[in-house]
Swiss-Prot record:
The keyword Ribosomal protein does not apply. Keywords: Acetylation, ATP-binding, Cytoplasm, Cytoskeleton, Hydrolase, Nucleotide-binding. The modification N-acetylaspartate is found at D2. The lineage of its organism: Eukaryota, Metazoa, Chordata, Cephalochordata, Leptocardii. This is Actin, cytoplasmic. It comes from Branchiostoma lanceolatum (Common lancelet). InterPro entries: Actin, Actin/actin-like_CS, Actin_CS, ATPase_NBD.
Length: 375
């Protein structure tokens, strides 16, 4: 690869797409992973109507569009719409020619083989990529924290995973997936705010609730104690101004919402909480490496951004683990983007330059090359 051409790094999440250039310390473009199509033809007079909208534009015109999320639970399920998102990323957001820049894409842990091949095929055949690579999201987050061994709890908008990693390689037999993430938290907050007498139902109002969640929610260290504090005083109450000027007050909802990460039964789910899932993941690993995993538990993704989450994880995992075990939860301040940052670091390493799948290798071997070169 030419050294003077910047590699592109694109992290496709269920909720947001993060894109930018290797070597940068943050993504240049962050936009919702949505594609919208007009519900009725010819509604918008004189708008020069397009047949589809992507990202922020789809979000702002959502009143007249049908919105689709091509990435569900971290996995691409709709390739036509995914192609639109990639096209938008290259041409509208980054404004580069994809045929000139090597590209690092990210994938969910346990991404099906056929999916990795399809991604590879689209990049080489539709976008004429000169070189590309597919990396596992959680592994990149671990790199971003300066480690090669540890366990990552990666929780985004659509899915959470616990991924044990040893010497840079994810251990597939011990990866656990939890379909409990940011979107569920937002829905749950909508539900409990409705119980307080505030009605939030439309997709537009859901965005408001997401904002309330991001600004005001936190994880309680001791849920029962926090509930009694909230019942006996108004010290935990905060107010929030809605776009129409109405002010609402929110109290115990602030910590009841993210509590569902630790008690999924709140959402009517039977799964284990994030703390227990992390512990179960560690227990599926070889006994000799567990110590390293307990001492290097890294939080990653937007849903781990709640204040108080690291202390609570520390408390819960300490209760589950052997009593002499040293437990350390690492919560980097930039963890919302740590997958992307890890990709930026990886793609700019000199030692990584021989790892790219080149167009020539793809032409010789076909899409299955991805399993041999990206692992």
């Amino acid at each position: 690869m030419d050294d003077d051409v910047a590699a592109l790094v694109v992290d496709n999440g269920s909720g947001m797409c993060k894109a930018g250039f290797a070597g940068d310390d943050a993504p240049r473009a962050v936009f919702p992973s949505i594609v919208g199509r007009p519900r009725h033809q010819g509604v918008m007079v004189g708008m020069g109507q397009k047949d589809s909208y992507v990202g922020d534009e789809a979000q702002s015109k959502r009143g007249i569009l049908t919105l689709k999320y091509p990435v569900e639970h971290g996995i691409v399920t709709n390739w036509d719409d995914m192609e639109k998102i990639w096209h938008h990323t290259f041409y509208n957001e980054l404004r580069i020619a994809p045929e000139e820049n090597p590209l690092l894409l990210t994938e969910a842990p346990l991404n099906p083989k056929a999916n990795r091949e399809k991604m590879t095929q689209i990049m080489f055949e539709t976008f004429n990529s000169p070189a590309m690579y597919v990396a596992i999201q959680a592994v990149l987050s671990l790199y971003a924290s300066g480690r090669t061994t540890g366990i990552v709890l990666d929780s985004g908008d659509g899915v959470s995973h616990t991924v044990p990693i040893y010497e840079g390689y994810a251990l597939p037999h011990a990866i656990l997936r939890l379909d409990l993430a940011g979107r569920d938290q937002t829905d749950y907050l909508m539900k409990i705010l409705t119980e307080r007498g505030y009605s939030f139902t439309t997709t537009a109002e859901r965005e408001i609730v997401r904002d309330i969640k991001e600004k005001l929610c936190y994880v309680a260290l001791d849920f029962e104690q926090e509930m009694s504090t909230a019942a006996s005083s108004s010290s935990l109450e905060k107010s929030y101004e809605l776009p129409d000027g109405q002010v609402i007050t929110i109290g115990n909802e602030r910590f009841r919402c993210p509590e569902s990460l630790f008690q999924p039964s709140f959402l009517g789910m039977e799964s284990t909480g994030v703390h227990e899932t992390t512990y179960n993941s560690i227990m599926k690993c070889d006994i000799d490496i567990r110590k390293d995993l307990y001492a290097n538990t890294v939080l990653s993704g937007g849903t781990t951004m709640f204040p108080g989450i690291a202390d609570r994880m520390q408390k819960e995992i300490t209760a589950l683990a052997p009593s002499t075990m040293k437990i350390k939860i690492i919560a980097p301040p930039e963890r919302k983007y740590s997958v992307w940052i890890g990709g930026s670091i990886l793609a700019s390493l000199s030692t990584f330059q021989q790892m790219w799948i080149s167009k020539q290798e793809y032409d010789e071997s076909g899409p299955s090359i991805v399993h041999r070169k990206c692992f």
